[in-house]
């Protein structure tokens, strides 16, 4: 897994012009609706092109619902995770996994210099692992065919 760079697992809806984002003054409800529509577990909070934070399903549950806040009036800036941890696009996927595991979070913002490229989540890792395992099994099968 360590050979592949993080950029290789960015999905279309989580990077570039399709990146799901919101302003800090938007309500939690509006952000949650957009997350549901886009089938994603996080939304980046951005203002004037600057990353301020990330709002995740866990933030919704812990910082809003469990705290008894009203989603229709609570602003994202009140419930987001400010200054989220980031990882460089060329860092190995293994490093992303390590950071998410050690930090007990499920989403990691991918950057190139000061530019946000996207978000990877723990949901992205199993698919990568399965694809690598399938490739390895195929390689071994071809090797076995040559030997026999």
Summary of predicted features, one role per range:
Residues 1-148:
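Tandem CBS (Cystathionine beta-synthase) repeat/Bateman regulatory domains
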């Amino acid at each position: 897994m360590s050979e592949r760079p993080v950029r290789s697992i960015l999905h279309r809806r989580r990077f570039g012009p399709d990146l799901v984002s919101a302003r800090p003054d938007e309500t939690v409800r509006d952000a949650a609706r957009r997350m549901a529509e886009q089938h994603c577990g996080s939304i980046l909070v951005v203002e004037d092109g600057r990353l301020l934070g990330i709002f995740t399903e866990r933030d919704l549950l812990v910082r809003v619902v469990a705290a008894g806040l009203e989603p229709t009036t609570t602003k994202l800036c009140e419930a987001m995770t400010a200054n989220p941890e980031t990882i460089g696009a060329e860092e190995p996927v293994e490093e992303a996994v390590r950071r998410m595991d050690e930090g007990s979070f499920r989403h990691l913002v991918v950057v190139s210099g000061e530019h946000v490229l996207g978000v990877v989540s723990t949901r992205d890792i199993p698919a990568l692992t399965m694809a690598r395992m399938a490739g390895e099994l195929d390689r071994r099968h071809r090797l076995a065919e040559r030997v026999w």
